[in-house]
Curated annotation (Swiss-Prot):
Keywords: DNA-binding, Metal-binding, Nickel, Transcription, Transcription regulation. Transcriptional regulator. CDD domains: RHH_NikR_HicB-like. NCBIfam families: PRK00630.1, PRK01002.1, PRK02967.1, PRK04460.1. It comes from Archaeoglobus fulgidus (strain ATCC 49558 / DSM 4304 / JCM 9628 / NBRC 100126 / VC-16). It holds the Pfam family RHH_1. Its cofactor is Ni(2+). This is Putative nickel-responsive regulator. Binds 1 nickel ion per subunit. Homotetramer. SUPFAM superfamilies: ACT-like, Ribbon-helix-helix.
């Protein structure tokens, strides 16, 4: 084993692993490990960007979630009320029988928006959260 490499074990739902394997095969990765390293690097880069942003921004928070997970819809509504001072509007889209997409337009201090992102990201049933910073307020 190469020095500096640590072997880990990860438990994943079968459907998630199957989809991941399909994608890495399509993209031509030589191994699952390399694809996981690439995914982790991407996650770290996005996290560092989120942490480095400061000041006032305008953007959209895109949230993909499984609405069958008990309480997730109510939690998202409650959070939007709790953060009403930075949320200008939201749009809810039913993607299929299981998944919904919420687009939340935000405007305000990045520090406050980060708190919202973290709370939504940690919610059970939320599958993906992406903050797209459209412009910095001048």
């Amino acid at each position: 084993m190469e020095e500096g490499i640590t072997r880990i074990g990860v438990s994943l739902p079968k459907n998630l692993l199957d989809e991941f394997d399909r994608i890495i095969s399509t993209r031509g990765y030589s191994s699952r490990s390399e694809a996981i390293r690439d995914a982790i690097r991407t996650y770290i880069t996005e996290y560092r960007w989120l942490e480095s942003e400061k000041g006032e921004i305008v953007g959209v928070l895109v949230v993909l979630y499984d609405h069958h997970v008990k309480g997730v819809s109510d939690l998202l509504i409650d959070l939007q009320h709790d953060f009403h001072e930075i949320i200008t509007s939201s749009t809810h889209i039913h993607l299929n029988e299981d998944q919904c997409l919420e687009m939340i337009l935000v405007k305000g201090k990045m520090e406050r928006i980060k708190v919202l992102v973290d709370k939504i990201s940690a919610a059970r049933g939320v599958m993906n959260v992406k903050l797209i910073s459209a412009v910095k307020k001048v």
